[in-house]
């Protein structure tokens, strides 16, 4: 799908990755409906994008609230596509989460993208064009210590996107999943004040944003955004989970995961 003049809804717009996606989409001519929980940051972002606040709209929404996903789509009105980027950090041992925190993580990371797609997809099918992009993670391909809750949402989102892609194909609507690895300067490690594992490399918000554009313009099924070594490890983990678990135990994954979970505890 050509992005010029298309109107897209972007959730999670004010985080580091969200801002990069917004800037790249706007640079390719898209008109954006930007959403997050913070109005001031949304308005600042809209004003900084190509075309400015006159071209891009903002909607404040907390997708952890019941009914927020459907209301966001209603408020956004007629759109040509969705980039579902909003997510909550959810690293930690399962028993350390309250039931409310479990529900919030599932609602934001998994349920809300599904409900937004459910509301938007029929409209796109009627038009015979459009695109839905879901931002996942390498945690949707391979699990690691203290990732049970987070990985469950990302594994689920990946499967949902693949299934929906098949359903929407006859209607001319594209569906893509974009799975970043460790992102420097943004993402869960940056937000938690933790360092990603050494010697495995990182990617950038700009590369994630570029993958979103490629996914839409070329109707790509899945794009993994990570250095070659990281992609290789993830692929091994996906195909051989027992071997991947052994490698992670030898490589200090438990310590790294503990640091990450500690940094995320107040952000759930």
Locate predicted features.
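Active-site helix of classical SDR
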Residues: 117, 153
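Conserved glycine-rich Rossmann-like NAD(P)H-binding loop of the short-chain dehydrogenase/reductase
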Residues: 28-45
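Active-site loop immediately N-terminal to the catalytic Tyr-X3-Lys motif
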Residues: 95, 144-148
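Conserved glycine-rich cofactor-binding loop
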Residues: 14-15
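C-terminal helical subdomain
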Residues: 177, 197-232
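Residue(s) in the substrate-gating loop at a strand-loop-helix junction
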Residues: 137
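Substrate-binding pocket helix/loop in short-chain dehydrogenase/reductase
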Residues: 93-106
